A protein has these predicted regions:
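NAD(P)+-binding Rossmann beta1-loop-alpha1 motif at the extreme N-terminus of oxidoreductases
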Residues: 1-50, 54
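Helix N-cap / loop-to-helix initiation motif
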Residues: 33, 58, 158, 207-211
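Rossmann-like NAD(P)-binding element
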Residues: 36, 50-111, 119
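NAD(P)-dependent Rossmann-like dehydrogenase/reductase catalytic/cofactor-binding core
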Residues: 2, 23-25, 163, 170-181, ...
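Rossmann-fold dinucleotide-binding core
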Residues: 111-180, 185-189
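Short glycine/serine/threonine-rich phosphate/pyrophosphate-binding segments
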Residues: 13-16, 95, 118-121
Length: 281
């Protein structure tokens, strides 16, 4: 394993590219527009500069890490990748298009992985002729800080591919946890319904935003309340994952009407300046 292509230069993709480059791999950072790639590269640059300020990294190490990252706006560049990690938006149609193209472009040995937080790996793998070499790698946000990677086998994922990705995750400084393919996997099957239930608690007038978050912080020792966490994740993302859970697992996972209303209003959390809390632009 020498070269890794990361598709999607946003918050997740940029973070994955950073930890891969820090682990010594050659990285191709890909997105559909040059401005997106440059923005992602700039965030990696800032993250590494912050590490230097904190004494966790030397200036010459930063230069070496950035030197391992190549910018790309063409999927054709995947022809030189040993592993592709797709970190595009959570949309099955887009993932289907990307994986079917990658299947044609990439050499036979290339492993195709997705950072999806909730979509079925088996279904994504079916868009390729190599389902045994398709696997889920669900990183947590922010990627450079969070240790967990959920490694999700599709129905056909081979043991050899799983072992390769497990070893790679360890080399990236992560802790891989094996998870079977089911809606939301483990992380979002547990976390997102908790946020949704907190929204229901607000919707039903049981307590205020601050009160709900304080109960979970002070009573359950959570570092952040569920409504503040929803704002951090993005309420559109929370709703999207709840829709996947609802479709796959039934009415128990129905999204709260208030969550739908906030998303329709454009109140998406921190990224839009308003969610359950207000934020400075």
């Amino acid at each position: 394993m020498k070269t890794i292509m990361v598709i999607g230069a946003g918050q997740m993709g940029g973070g994955i590219a950073q930890v891969a480059a820090q682990a010594g791999y050659s990285v191709i950072l890909n997105d559909i527009k040059e401005e997106f790639v440059n923005r992602g590269f700039g965030i990696i640059d800032k993250n590494l500069s912050r590490s230097i300020e904190k004494g966790k990294l030397k200036a010459e190490e930063k230069d070496l890490i950035l030197g391992r990252i190549t910018k790309s706006i063409s999927l054709q560049d995947a022809v030189s990748a040993d592993l592709v990690i797709e970190a595009a938006i959570e949309n099955m149609g887009i993932k289907a298009q990307v994986f079917s193209q990658l299947d044609v472009i990439c050499p036979e040995h290339t492993i195709l992985s997705t950072n999806t937080s909730s979509l079925p790996i088996t279904e994504i793998a079916a868009f390729t002729k190599r389902p045994d070499r398709v696997i889920g790698m669900h990183f947590m946000n922010p990627v450079p800080v969070m240790k967990l990677v959920e490694v999700i086998r599709g129905l056909a994922t081979s043991d050899e591919v799983y072992k390769t990705i497990e070893d790679l995750s360890l080399k990236m400084g992560k802790t891989p946890v094996e998870v079977n393919d089911a809606p939301g996997f483990v992380a979002n099957r547990v976390l997102i319904p908790m946020i949704n239930e907190a929204v229901y608690t607000l919707y039903e007038g049981i307590a205020s935003v601050e009160a709900i978050d304080n109960v979970m912080k002070l009573g359950m020792n959570h570092p952040m309340g569920p409504l503040a966490l929803g704002d951090l994740i993005g309420l559109d993302t929370v709703l999207s994952i709840m829709e996947v859970l609802h479709e796959g697992l039934g009415d128990k996972y129905r999204p709260c009407p208030l969550l739908r209303k906030y998303v329709k209003a454009g109140w998406l959390g921190r990224k839009s300046g308003r969610g359950f809390y207000k934020y400075d632009a």
